[in-house]
Amino acid sequence: MSEDLSMKCGLEIHVQVDTNSKLFCQCPTNYKDVEPNTNICPVCIGHPGAKPMPPNKKAIDVAIMVAKMLDCEMVIDKDIYFQRKHYNYPDLPSGYQKTSVPIGEHGTFLGVGITEVHLEEDPGQYKPDLGTVDYNRSGTPLIEIVTDPDMKSPEEAREFLRQLMRLFRYIGHLRGEGTMRADTNISIKYNGIQGNRVEVKNVNSIRGVYKVLKYELIRQKNVLRRGGEIKMETRAFMESQMITKGMRSKETADDYRYIPDPDLQPIVLNNNWVEKVEAQMPETPMNKEKRFVEQYGIKEDDAKVLVSDLELADVFEKVVAELGNDKNGISLAVTWIRNELKRVLVYNKIEFFETNLKPEHMVELINSIKDKTISQKIGKTIIEQMVEHKGEKTPKELITEMGLTVIEDTSELEKACEEAIKNSEKAVEDYKSGNQRALNSVVGQVMKLTRGRAEPGTVVKILKKKIDG
C-alpha cells in the first residue's frame, strides 16, 4: 500500500548582531574568551530597579538591513515597542526577555514567506549538567527571523538556511552560523490524517535542523501509522544521539504573558532612517551571481561557487581586473580561483579569509603560468604551498625556494624524453600502432622525471620527433 506523506516546516531563526556593547547596556558582548559572569551589570542580570538604556542603534540598523534584504515591508511611522516575554528559566534572571514587536513583516526569501523580523536580547548560558549559569551572553542583541510554514522537506529547510547564512555573511555585522539557533516547527499529514505542530527548541546548526526534521518526520509518521495522536508539544534536540525528546506541552502567546516594557520608549522608524540604511546595503549573493554571469560571461555553476564565499568573489573580480578584464584573463581567473584555489580550500576545510592570501598572490601565480615560468602542474603545487604557508610567501619566492621553474635547457628535456621512451616500451609500441593516447603515458613519465618542471607541449613535440623519426 502506497503512503501519502507530506510535511510543513517553519523556522524561528536567531542570530547575534556583532556589536561592541549589549542591546540595553554598555557591557561588552564578548562572552567566549572571558571568565564567567564578568561582562555583566545590574541591567544584564535583572537587578530590581535597574533601568535599561535605549536600544543599541547599530542593532536596530542591522535589523532594518536584514528585513530589507528579506524583502519585508518595513513598519514605518508606527510605535515599535519592546515587550516583556515572561518565562522562568535560570538563564533569564529577570524572569522575562525583552523582545520587540516586528520591525519588518510579510517578506520572502527563496520562495519561503518571512512572517516577521524583530530584535530581542539573548539569555545567559545555562548548563544543567553542571548546574552553572554564565550571564556574560545575557543582553547580547539578537535578530529573530520567523518564517511561514512553507518548507516541504528537510532538504528544502537545509538549503534555505545555507542560503540565509550566506546572505548574513554578505550583510556583515552578524555573527553567523556559529551563534545561530533555530526553533524548528514541523507538522505532517499521513494518509489523510493531519498531525499537530511540534516545536524543537534551540537547534544550533544547519546540520542539526536537517537531522531534527528527518527524525521528526519518521517519528510522527510512525505515531500516526499506529493510530496515535501527535501531541502539540515542545521537544529538545539530543545532539549526541540525533533524536528529539519531549520537554513540555507547546506554549501559546498567552502563556508568555506579553506586556509592553514600561522602562523602554518605542522606536519609530521613518523613511529617511530606512533609506540611510539601504544606502549602506551590499549587493545580495543572488544579484552578484547574476551579474557575474552577465558581466564576465562565466557559467552559472562557476558563478555560484565563487559567490558562495564573499572574499573569494572579491578576489576573483580584483584578479580579473589585474589580468586585463578580457576573455583570456577571465578564463584563467576561473580556472585558478574557482577550480584550483577552491579545491585546496575544500581539502583543508577552511574559508578564503583564513589563508591570508591577497589578490596579488593569485595574479603573480597566474602570470607565472602565462609566461611559462612554471607549468600548470607546478602551479597546482604552488597554490597548495601558498595556502599551507598562510600567504607568508609569494608564488615567486616559493618557485625559487623549491627550484620549480620550467626547464628551458633543450638537451636536459631531450635526455628526460629518451629515458622515458626507454622505460615505456609498450606505450611507445601502442603509439606507433596508431593509439595516439598511448603517448600520454610517456609524457607522464617525462613529467615525473622532471618533477613537473617540463612544459607538456614542448615534451610532446620532442617525443613525437624522437619516436616518429
UniProtKB/Swiss-Prot annotation:
GO terms for molecular function: asparaginyl-tRNA synthase (glutamine-hydrolyzing) activity; ATP binding; glutaminyl-tRNA synthase (glutamine-hydrolyzing) activity. It catalyses: L-glutamyl-tRNA(Gln) + L-glutamine + ATP + H2O = L-glutaminyl-tRNA(Gln) + L-glutamate + ADP + phosphate + H(+); L-aspartyl-tRNA(Asn) + L-glutamine + ATP + H2O = L-asparaginyl-tRNA(Asn) + L-glutamate + ADP + phosphate + 2 H(+). The keyword rRNA-binding does not apply. Its EC number is 6.3.5.-. Keywords: ATP-binding, Ligase, Nucleotide-binding, Protein biosynthesis. Allows the formation of correctly charged Asn-tRNA(Asn) or Gln-tRNA(Gln) through the transamidation of misacylated Asp-tRNA(Asn) or Glu-tRNA(Gln) in organisms which lack either or both of asparaginyl-tRNA or glutaminyl-tRNA synthetases. The reaction takes place in the presence of glutamine and ATP through an activated phospho-Asp-tRNA(Asn) or phospho-Glu-tRNA(Gln). PROSITE patterns: GATB. InterPro entries: Asn/Gln-tRNA_amidoTrfase_suB/E, Asn/Gln-tRNA_Trfase_suB/E_cat, Asn/Gln_amidotransferase, Asn/Gln_tRNA_amidoTrase-B-like, GatB, GatB_C_1, GatB_Yqey_C_2, Gln-tRNA_amidoTrfase_suB_CS. The gene is gatB. HAMAP family: GatB. SMART domains: GatB_Yqey. One of its GO terms (biological process) is translation. Heterotrimer of A, B and C subunits. It comes from the Archaea. The keyword ATP-binding applies. SUPFAM superfamilies: GatB/YqeY motif (SSF89095), Glutamine synthetase/guanido kinase (SSF55931). The lineage of its organism: Archaea, Methanobacteriati, Methanobacteriota, Methanomada group, Methanococci. This is Aspartyl/glutamyl-tRNA(Asn/Gln) amidotransferase subunit B. It holds the Pfam family GatB_Yqey. Belongs to the GatB/GatE family. GatB subfamily.
